[in-house]
């Protein structure tokens, strides 16, 4: 279906092209339709606002139809087209993610087997197919690792039994991925502060251990 925009000076501002089967056969027999007559094929597309006959199509004037209805139909058709394209695109991308190289490996193996006519060529074809299969297995394994990985956690707030929102004892932040234990061993620190405290505590314990080892070495020469 084709739509054309005409200026206001013409007798019609919208036209469409439809098939003969969609209209009555009498439309092509110079019969009057809404005060318009079908023109000769040579004069087709030279005048506006009339019914034209050309090959297997006829052009019908929209001068008797409200523009609001026409625009609404066009808008609905465009929305349906975009929705269909998105569905097909998402389906194709999901299939490509599951088996990204299966089609390429299969086509390569088949083409090599068709062109081989001697035993040496057959051996080369099988060798290339084996390489392609191993490459496909490695790629599939790589994609499977991505799909089975744990999703990223989001920050959240915790409401205490008394109705107050829990906050970090160090930075006073209320949003965190998880609560971690600090000096009080009561999970009073947010995730960043808890990780920093753990690293600092680990360094302090390492220094204490090294100092204790030095004292032991001095006492036992």
Curated annotation (Swiss-Prot):
Pfam entry (one): GATA
GO CC annotations, alphabetized: cytoplasm; nucleus
UniProt record, GO biological process: regulation of DNA-templated transcription; rRNA processing
Biased composition range(s): Polar residues: 101-110
Record keywords: Cytoplasm, DNA-binding, Metal-binding, Nucleus, rRNA processing, Zinc, Zinc-finger
Disordered: annotated segments: 101-121, 137-161, 201-221
Gene3D superfamilies reported for this sequence: Erythroid Transcription Factor GATA-1, subunit A (3.30.50.10)
Chief location category: cytoplasm
Miscellaneous comment in the UniProt entry for this protein: Present with 2100 molecules/cell in log phase SD medium.
The name this protein goes by in its record: Pre-rRNA-processing protein SRD1
Organism: Saccharomyces cerevisiae (strain ATCC 204508 / S288c) (Baker's yeast)
């Amino acid at each position: 279906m084709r739509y054309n925009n005409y200026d206001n000076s013409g007798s019609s501002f919208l036209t469409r092209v439809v098939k003969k089967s969609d209209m009555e056969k009498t439309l092509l027999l110079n019969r009057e339709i809404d005060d318009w007559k079908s023109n000769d094929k040579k004069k087709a597309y030279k005048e506006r606002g009339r019914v034209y006959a050309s090959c297997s199509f006829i052009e019908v004037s929209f001068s008797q139809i409200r523009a609001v209805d026409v625009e609404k139909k066009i808008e609905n058709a465009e929305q349906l087209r975009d929705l269909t394209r998105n569905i097909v695109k998402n389906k194709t991308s999901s299939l490509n993610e599951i088996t990204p190289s299966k089609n390429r490996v299969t086509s390569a193996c088949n083409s090599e087997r068709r062109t081989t006519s001697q035993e040496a060529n057959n051996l080369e074809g099988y060798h290339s197919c084996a390489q392609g299969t191993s490459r496909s297995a490695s790629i599939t394994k790589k994609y499977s690792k991505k799909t089975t990985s744990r999703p990223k956690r989001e920050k959240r707030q915790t409401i205490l039994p008394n109705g107050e929102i829990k906050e970090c004892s160090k930075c006073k932040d209320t949003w965190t991925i998880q609560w971690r234990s600090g000096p009080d061993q009561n999970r009073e620190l947010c995730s960043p502060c808890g990780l920093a405290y753990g690293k600092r505590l680990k360094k302090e314990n390492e220094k204490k251990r090294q100092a204790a080892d030095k004292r032991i070495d001095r006492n036992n020469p």
